[in-house]
């Protein structure tokens, strides 16, 4: 499934380059128009990211996210700055199809395990942003990609897979926002290790050829952001290829 992504800072659509907030690009698209465009082109679910909240939970774009969830009648998964049971509950009550949990899965892992059991695996997406070192070690980065965790991707997946986690959004930070092609080796390796997990590929998709290769690699879901915003190809083309 192709999942279009919309990242927001102060109500504006943006894209970061390799997760760096200092290299953000603003787009003039109206968020309501672009989300509706994706839906009309066949999106089954839209990935919405509150980058203000990801960087600082106290700055979450709460009102905007709520308005978007109330406005649209299609499925949306929401991430960015989700740090508490109340955050998860509120988003689901406001209409989010899934809630994306990132930094909290590292900083407060026991609490997140409770959320998974409480709200169910269909409502939670585990978001693991990784920095792949030269030696191949895959370290999870947190807090808006600002901090390293000293925790490996595999160790987090191992723990949550025993609890029945279904959806995992995995981003290679060095590929994010580049449109230079995904790290297919990363996704092939983790898909083989954790066969019961539905991985969402994120980072690097820039051409239709990338989409075709991603589909052939066995990844269930493919998240695309910048390439769609810059009209490198349409969502409809990505779905049909």
Curated annotation (Swiss-Prot):
Q: What does the record give as EC number?
A: 5.3.1.16
Q: Write down the Gene3D superfamilies for this protein, in alphabetical order.
A: Aldolase class I
What top-level branch of life does the organism fall under? Bacteria
Active-site annotation: 7 (proton acceptor), 129 (proton donor)
Please verify whether the record's keywords include Ribonucleoprotein: no
Q: Name one GO molecular function term.
A: 1-(5-phosphoribosyl)-5-[(5-phosphoribosylamino)methylideneamino]imidazole-4-carboxamide isomerase activity
Q: Does the keyword Isomerase apply?
A: yes
Q: Which InterPro entries match?
A: Aldolase_TIM (IPR013785), His_biosynth (IPR006062), HisA_bact_arch (IPR006063), Isoase_HisA-like (IPR044524), Isoase_HisA-like_bact (IPR023016), RibuloseP-bd_barrel (IPR011060)
Q: Which terms under GO biological process does the entry name?
A: L-histidine biosynthetic process; L-tryptophan biosynthetic process
- What Pfam family is a match for this entry? His_biosynth
Please name the top-level EC class of this enzyme.
isomerase
This protein's UniProt keywords: Amino-acid biosynthesis, Cytoplasm, Histidine biosynthesis, Isomerase
Please tell me one Gene Ontology term that the record gives under cellular component: cytoplasm
Kindly list the places in or outside the cell where this protein is found, as annotated in its UniProt entry: Cytoplasm
Main localization is cytoplasm
Question: What is the catalytic activity of this protein?
Answer: 1-(5-phospho-beta-D-ribosyl)-5-[(5-phospho-beta-D-ribosylamino)methylideneamino]imidazole-4-carboxamide = 5-[(5-phospho-1-deoxy-D-ribulos-1-ylimino)methylamino]-1-(5-phospho-beta-D-ribosyl)imidazole-4-carboxamide
NCBIfam families annotated for this entry?
1-(5-phosphoribosyl)-5-[(5-phosphoribosylamino)methylideneamino]imidazole-4-carboxamide isomerase (TIGR00007)
Assigned protein family: Belongs to the HisA/HisF family.
The protein here is known as 1-(5-phosphoribosyl)-5-[(5-phosphoribosylamino)methylideneamino] imidazole-4-carboxamide isomerase
Underlying gene: hisA
């Amino acid at each position: 499934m192709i999942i279009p992504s919309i990242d927001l800072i102060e109500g504006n659509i943006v894209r970061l380059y390799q997760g760096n907030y200092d290299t953000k690009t603003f787009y003039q698209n109206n968020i309501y128009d672009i989300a509706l465009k994706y839906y009309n082109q066949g999106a089954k679910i839209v990935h919405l990211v509150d980058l203000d909240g990801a960087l600082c939970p106290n700055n979450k774009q709460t009102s905007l996210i709520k308005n978007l969830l109330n406005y649209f009648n299609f499925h949306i998964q929401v991430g960015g700055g989700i740090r508490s049971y109340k955050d998860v509950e509120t988003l689901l009550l406001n209409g989010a199809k899934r809630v994306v949990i990132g930094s909290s899965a590292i900083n407060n892992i026991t609490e997140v395990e409770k959320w998974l059991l409480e709200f169910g695996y269909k409502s939670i997406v585990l978001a693991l942003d990784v920095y792949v070192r030269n030696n191949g070690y895959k370290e999870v980065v947190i807090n808006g990609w600002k901090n390293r965790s000293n925790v490996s991707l595999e160790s987090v997946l191992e723990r949550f897979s025993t609890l029945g986690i279904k959806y995992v959004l995995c981003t290679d930070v060095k590929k994010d926002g580049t449109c230079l092609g995904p790290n297919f080796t990363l996704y092939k390796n983790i898909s083989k290790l954790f066969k019961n997990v539905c991985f969402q590929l994120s980072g690097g998709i820039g051409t239709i050829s990338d989409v075709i290769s991603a589909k052939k690699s066995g990844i269930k879901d493919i998240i695309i952001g910048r390439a769609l915003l810059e009209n490198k190809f349409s969502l409809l083309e990505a779905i049909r290829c």
